[in-house]
Amino acid sequence: MLDSKLVRTQLQEIVGRLATRGFQLDVARFESLEAQRKAVQTRTEQLQAERNARSKTIGQAKSRGEDIAPLLAEVDRMGSDLEAGKRELDAIQAELDALMLSIPNLPHESVPVGADEEDNVEVRRWGVPRTFDFAIKDHVALGERHGWLDFETAAKLSGARFALMRGPIARLHRALAQFMLDLHTGEHGYEEAYTPYLVQAPALQGTGQLPKFEEDLFKISREGEADFYLIPTAEVSLTNIVAGEILDARQLPLKFVAHTPCFRSEAGASGRDTRGMIRQHQFDKVEMVRIVDPAKSYEALEELTANAEKVLQRLELPYRVLALCTGDMGFSATKTYDLEVWVPSQDKYREISSCSNCGDFQARRMQARWRNPETGKPELVHTLNGSGLAVGRTLVAVLENYQQADGSIRVPEVLKPYMGGIEVIG
């Protein structure tokens, strides 16, 4: 959530920066609610001051032996008016809060301005896509060859956009996740966490999925109890570890990593990536989250992105890094890098990781703070998150990039210890 004081004092600048994201702030509504809030707040404060003064008068009149019944009646009336004013102020503030929760983060000045993914800027590439001397297969054909990747049975169980993995491919999927966790904990300094897969609405509001993107979530309604939501990413549970906390400066940076399933309705993805594992309702992801000193968050973004890149480098998978433009960034991000891995069957790079600095946007929603030793006061932290990596899409890339002419798959060198020494699948 943006700082409401910043929006009030720099409204036109904020409107302009949001417009680069394709977001049109309802200025008339904001100014109307602000005017109402100020008027009611002023009236309520004046009424409170008058009531306090009248209350003092009652004591003085009583000591003089005067009839205080009229004064008591007036104070009671003022009390009723004051309660009504507070209720009105609360209602206006609730509308303002709802409006503020609908506004995306401001793009950092270094973010390229653009409308959509066509305006993203390539930053660098690593590796060279392999040249095949045989007709390549996609991951679906490779996986179904021995029944180790079974979309038909998955559809029987759960419908479209699910996968059933068996045998060596299931093991390879597990090996990838274990390798990613070991790399991030052993070399990159992250603390592994096991988090709930079900969270309540405040956690999703804290990281920005609610209230705006509820249709993208799977919701479990419970009669008489708070609803549950299946996590769309471990970013939600990991980042909310610090919700409502005031951290000591010595605790920063916090670096968490978790391997979880992720659940998404893919409400806006009708007709896209209907074949295979690229876009699923349920998929595994290794997620990295950092909680940092605000002065160090952009440096932390570069490190976070490098951590995700290291996974692809160790797997020897060609990839590129994109700086997302203003119109393609996620709701909570102020700056984002996407990693795209080479997918031979599609002859193009596909997203496999998104690494974002959210600044104080999520922290303000969560009230996650640290005590700044220079001021001695609690201040908002900065939060970052990134995929390190999406396990299913990494599996797709491994299957396709390591395929051989006979349809078998070479196991990447770095995964062999996790595969019991198996060198070839199929």
Curated annotation (Swiss-Prot):
Name any one Pfam family assigned in the record.
Seryl_tRNA_N
Taking the record's annotation, the residue ranges forming a coiled coil are none
Binding-site list for L-serine: 233-235, 287, 387
Listed binding positions for ATP are 264-266, 351-354
Q: What is its main location?
A: cytoplasm
Q: Which locations, inside or outside the cell, does it occupy?
A: Cytoplasm
Its Enzyme Commission number(s) read: 6.1.1.11
InterPro entries, sorted = aa-tRNA-synt_IIb (IPR002314), aa-tRNA-synth_II (IPR006195), aa-tRNA-synth_II/BPL/LPL (IPR045864), Ser-tRNA-ligase_type_1 (IPR002317), Ser-tRNA-synth_1_N (IPR015866), SerRS_1_N_sf (IPR042103), SerRS_core (IPR033729), tRNA-bd_arm (IPR010978)
- Looking at the record's lineage, which domain of life comes first? Bacteria
TM region positions: none
One annotated GO molecular function: ATP binding
The record lists the catalysed reaction(s) as: tRNA(Ser) + L-serine + ATP = L-seryl-tRNA(Ser) + AMP + diphosphate + H(+); tRNA(Sec) + L-serine + ATP = L-seryl-tRNA(Sec) + AMP + diphosphate + H(+)
User: Keywords of this protein's UniProt record, alphabetized?
Assistant: Aminoacyl-tRNA synthetase, ATP-binding, Cytoplasm, Ligase, Nucleotide-binding, Protein biosynthesis
What this chain does, per the record? Answer: Catalyzes the attachment of serine to tRNA(Ser). Is also able to aminoacylate tRNA(Sec) with serine, to form the misacylated tRNA L-seryl-tRNA(Sec), which will be further converted into selenocysteinyl-tRNA(Sec).
HAMAP family attached to this UniProt entry: Ser_tRNA_synth_type1
NCBIfam families (UniProt xref): serS (TIGR00414)
The identity of this protein, by name, is: Serine--tRNA ligase
